[in-house]
């Protein structure tokens, strides 16, 4: 078992996400920084998309109630296992009774804690990810709180050694494709979207990142029919300030879509702190597909290397 001593401000169970239910209004959910989740899981011998803890802004303390292995990835924060420093991107042994403590991150926003065997909570609609809107997944469909105890599954590996891997770097230059209504915005707004810095609003959450910057204006007042939405779509509501839809976003909407962030760059957004400028970089569909293929190839190679170690 894994006992939550101090839950932090926003800690949930997340995995690779909930697929195939968008027609029923069920959001994708899942880890916001998918590369960090996958690296943590692969380090401890789990499936890449196994359930783990997503910890926003640190300030977490957990107690391990069984021996095993864990890995901490994502945001760079000061972490300690009892009195020993813990590096992110490393697989390390844990003993029953030991406590892992995370302070507020110095770099990034979200950390991921995976344990060998995974967080063993029951899947709902094919996923263990917490959906706070619907109240499903994770532990009772809610944020974790002090005193919670989470079961740990059986490890797939009989033996391991301490090991670290290089994490994917994140930055504030985010590649995106023009959206379906891109050409409904005036030229000044199109230029501003790509050339002007955007600030992440404090009203941002796992549903959407609200951006602050130059007001974007359309050249038409036509109303749009409701359309399907996915994480990464950049909507522009009536106030002219963009909203980037994130993993917990609604599945339909009617605001104009000025752009869509490429899948391979979504993890950058998960780690950008409030107040840091965001710059969008226009790319082609071919570049977006290549970026996704390169990222998939990286994880295939990492999984092979870790599976065949020793």
Curated annotation (Swiss-Prot):
Catalytic activity: 5-oxo-L-proline + ATP + 2 H2O = L-glutamate + ADP + phosphate + H(+)
Alphabetical list of SMART domains matching this protein: AHS2 (SM00797)
GO cellular component, one term: cytosol
Deletion consequences: Deletion of the gene slows growth on minimal medium with ammonium as nitrogen source.
Molecular function (Gene Ontology), one example: 5-oxoprolinase (ATP-hydrolyzing) activity
Keywords for this protein: ATP-binding, Hydrolase, Nucleotide-binding
UniProt-listed Enzyme Commission number(s): 3.5.2.9
InterPro entries, per the entry: 5-oxoprolinase_subunit (IPR053526), CT_A_B (IPR003778), Cyclophilin-like_dom_sf (IPR029000), PxpC (IPR052708)
PANTHER family listed in its UniProt record: 5-OXOPROLINASE SUBUNIT C (PTHR43309:SF3)
Subunit: Forms a complex composed of PxpA, PxpB and PxpC.
Family: Belongs to the PxpC family.
Function field: Catalyzes the cleavage of 5-oxoproline to form L-glutamate coupled to the hydrolysis of ATP to ADP and inorganic phosphate.
Protein name listed in UniProt: 5-oxoprolinase subunit C
Gene that encodes it: pxpC
């Amino acid at each position: 078992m894994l006992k939550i001593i101090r839950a932090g401000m926003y800690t949930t169970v997340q995995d690779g996400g909930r697929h195939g239910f968008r027609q029923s209004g069920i959001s994708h959910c899942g880890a916001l920084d998918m590369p960090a989740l996958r690296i943590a899981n692969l380090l401890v011998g789990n499936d890449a998309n196994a359930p783990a803890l997503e910890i926003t802004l640190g300030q977490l303390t957990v107690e391990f109630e069984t021996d095993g292995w864990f890995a901490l990835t994502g945001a760079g924060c000061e972490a300690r296992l009892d009195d020993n420093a813990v590096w992110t991107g490393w697989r390390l042994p844990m003993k029953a009774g030991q406590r892992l403590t995370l302070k507020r991150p110095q770099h990034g926003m979200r950390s991921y804690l995976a344990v060998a065997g995974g967080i063993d909570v029951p899947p709902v609609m094919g996923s263990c990810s917490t959906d706070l809107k619907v109240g499903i997944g994770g532990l009772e469909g809610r944020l974790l709180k002090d005193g919670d105890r989470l079961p740990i599954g059986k490890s797939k590996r009989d033996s391991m050694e301490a090991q670290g891997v290089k994490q994917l770097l994140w930055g504030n230059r985010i590649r995106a494709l023009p959206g379906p209504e891109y050409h409904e915005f005036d030229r000044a707004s199109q230029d501003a979207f790509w050339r002007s810095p955007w600030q992440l609003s404090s009203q941002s959450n796992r549903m959407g990142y609200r951006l602050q910057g130059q007001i974007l204006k359309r050249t038409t007042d036509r109303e749009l029919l409701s359309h399907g939405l996915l994480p990464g779509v950049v909507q522009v509501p009536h106030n002219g300030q963009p909203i980037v839809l994130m993993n917990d976003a609604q599945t339909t909407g009617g605001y104009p879509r000025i752009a869509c962030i490429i899948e391979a760059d979504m993890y950058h957004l998960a780690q950008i702190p409030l107040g840091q400028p965001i710059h969008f970089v226009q790319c082609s569909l071919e570049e977006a597909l290549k970026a996704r293929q390169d990222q998939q190839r990286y994880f295939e190679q990492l999984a092979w290397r870790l599976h065949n170690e020793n």
